Amino acid sequence: MLTLIVALLPWLLARRGVTMSRTKFGLTLVFDSENADGTPVRLLNVNGTFQSVSYVPEDLRFELACVYHRSMAEVIEGLGGSPRVLVMGGGGYSLPKYLAAHVRRTRTDVVEVDPAITRVARESFFLDECLEQTGAAREGRLNLFNGDAWGFLRAAGEPYDVIVNDAFSGKRPLGPLSSAEGARVVREHLGKDGVYLANVRCATSGRRSRALREVAEAFGREFAHVCYVPEWPDEPEKPGNNTFVATSAEAILPTDAVVVK
């Protein structure tokens, strides 16, 4: 009986509008829901952890549904010129899609370790639709790579103006990017006045805020300015997706930033 249930599980989930697949980091589910104001959204869940969310309506598909992505976009949009951006971790490709559609002066490289996740993004999170409508790939404004983002960064020959760390396996960040070595390598591969942005998943106060403290300490040794934007400013002990910012430039801080250094 158990074997039969397991065999029927994909069919049962599909009946409920849930698409199931196997990816590098476990069982991956894609399904539709609504956000707090009733707007239809599509969610990506990998091995029991939500990894990405996208609006479903056609006029919102390239907009940003997550607060931390909006904070990152605010920083990037505040930079002059034609910033070179490295996004480590594709997931649903929310930020790359936004940059391709709305910040057309950026040139963005995205490195996703799992080709299966990129396929999910292309087919279910409107990535192919974005590439077709914006022409970003044809114009060299959005370049997709499958591989180890940490290795890609270390091998990069030219500096980036922005490095975004949005790479996760479940709830844990991928690679040594919270360590002293990670902070040093990031600094070495950023250009003058470059900015490092990261999604740090934890609380901002209390015993569950250790990850944020470690990242702030490591990057505070390498950069003049360190701050973060909490997802839950009124509930600091609640784990959330917090936007971490490190730079040595007099950059514009994102709205509601908490200055560490």
Segments and roles (model prediction):
Residues 41, 193, 240-241:
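Active-site lining segments that contact anionic ligands and/or coordinate catalytic metals
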Residues 202:
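Active-site-proximal loop/turn and secondary-structure-junction residues that shape catalytic pockets
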Residues 61-197, 205-212, 220-222, 237:
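The AdoMet/dcAdoMet-binding core of the Class I SAM-like
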